[in-house]
Regions:
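A hydrophobic, helix-centered structural microdomain
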Residues: 40-105, 141, 213, 218-233
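Short, conserved catalytic or interaction motifs in soluble domains
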Residues: 152, 188, 210
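Short beta-strand/loop motif that positions the catalytic acidic residue
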Residues: 205
Length: 233
């Protein structure tokens, strides 16, 4: 009497900050509190995105100019790396990043996952990845509405097609706009395997279910720590 009873998925979610994919049922995704967002939530998030991206571009412009010069000095090729990514509801957009790999890094191999100690990465690129400064041009993607500041990281369409066949509920992560940074990025180490993708999906589903301005601010603060202490990839 007076004791709250929770099912296992709910208890696991609260204890770990992620949703256990192996225990999910389609009905739970439909009826569980949190997955259906109101128009008010979407408007607030968009205002947050536009404000933060606008201020970020203005403040980061001198740093972005220095990064562009460093990339040009070290290696030939374009400063920006532009690549198709799967966005909200599977719509493909062009993602902008500072180039961190040598030019034509995938020539002869086709699309492959980045590795932790990737031999294709330049010295400047390695620093940019550790500090996540390579993501700064994506502020423009946020302003254009392709991305949100906070959300699941966008994957390449080729990887999405492959992963959705191997991981249950993988496409649920496309129900919101992808982000420059996200819950999975601040809670989980870098990984490039199917097992890593499952783990990151569990964090992404938690974010989607519990999406709020407070959670976005929490992720943003954690991301700032990653940038300051170079704890990225």
């Amino acid at each position: 009497r007076g004791i709250a009873v929770e099912d296992w998925p709910t208890f696991y979610e609260k204890a770990t900050g992620k949703i256990l994919v192996a225990e999910l049922r389609p009905s739970w995704l439909i009826f569980a509190d949190g997955f259906v967002k109101t128009a008010r939530t979407e408007v607030i998030k968009r205002l947050f995105d536009v404000t933060l991206a606008s201020v970020g571009l203005i403040l980061a412009f001198p740093l972005m100019a220095l990064v562009a010069i460093a990339i040009k000095i070290e290696s030939s090729g374009p400063v920006l790396f532009r690549q198709p990514r799967s966005g909200q509801n599977g719509c493909v957009f062009i993602l902008n990043k500072f180039r961190s790999m040598r030019q034509d890094a995938e020539e002869g191999t086709g699309p492959v996952w980045a590795q932790k100690a990737d031999p294709r990465v330049t010295r400047v690129g390695g620093f940019l990845r550790r500090t996540r400064l390579d993501e700064l041009p994506q502020l423009l993607n946020v302003l254009l509405g392709h991305m949100s500041f906070i959300g699941p990281r966008p994957e390449r369409p080729e990887f999405v097609q492959s992963l959705q066949k191997e991981i249950p509920y993988y496409m649920k992560r496309l129900s919101v706009k992808p982000g420059i940074t996200g819950w999975a990025q601040v809670k989980y180490r870098y990984g490039a395997s199917v097992e890593d993708s499952i783990e990151k999906l569990q964090y992404d589903l938690y974010y989607i279910k519990n999406l709020s301005l407070f959670l976005d601010l929490l992720i943003l603060l954690n991301t700032v720590q990653v940038v300051l202490f170079a704890r990225g990839r």
